[in-house]
Amino acid sequence: MIVLREGTNGWTCITDWPASPGNDPMCIDDMFAKWNDALGAGAPLTVDRPGVAYMLAGGSDASNTDPFAMAPAAGEEWISTPAHVMLLSPGGFDAANFAATPKQDEPYIMWDGTPYEHLMVPVVPISQEAMGDVSAEMQNTMSAGPAGIVKNATIMGNPTVEGGEMVVLQEGTNGWICYPDRAVSPGNDPQCNDTISDAGFAAGATRTVPSAGLSYMLAGGSDESNTDPMASGPAAGEEWISTPSHLMFMVPGGFDTKFFTTDHMSGYPYIMWAGTDLEHIMIPVVDMPME
């Protein structure tokens, strides 16, 4: 390969892979660059920190089980995945929490059990048509995630009386739970959590989760503070933090500020509530709004 432009931010963007029938350019961080080099060389790899890669144009792969396959096995077809993010975790990904077969509209593990195991995370939100005939509150909550997640998730609704408990609008079957827009924030911020992230947030302990956890906020969100998880509003002289469509990702041990910024306006994946028990990274999947 040749260098078309020298970069300054530590990320590397790679053109479409000509051997595949689809369009699959990608942009990868430093950990994923090491992963990519090891994969290309067929070399051993130790994933010693989280990694993030973008494939927002989609992609196609020859196999979900063999990292070295150059074409699909006899009788099989190329695997096509729409716009997605790829994630690395030092502990890998638990097949009890994520599918190990390709999915168009929910996260799945690629190359499970190999040194190159990673999570494929589709980021196309459910369409209005796919939601079906549901209430406005259900529609808002379901807008947080892709169809494969939200159609089978537990959907929570706001309390019917002031000070009451949230109500269940839909009983789920896939372990995910989706919450409605927070009335206390000025933005629209429904979210869908997998079992790991939901338990981590509920316990106030996202840095000590037993394995990698994931949340969707594809409708975007707004937060009081990027440093204080207990803030009840923005600090004096500051404004609400608005983040467009994004993922939230947590891993055991949290994230190192040497590799991820804490600047919520950077446009890069950034650490929210760094150094606290609720630390996680926010991964924008569209351009950040400019102030």
Which stretches of residues belong to each language-model region?
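Primary mode marks residue(s) on the alpha4-beta5-alpha5 output face of response regulator receiver
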Residues: 1-291
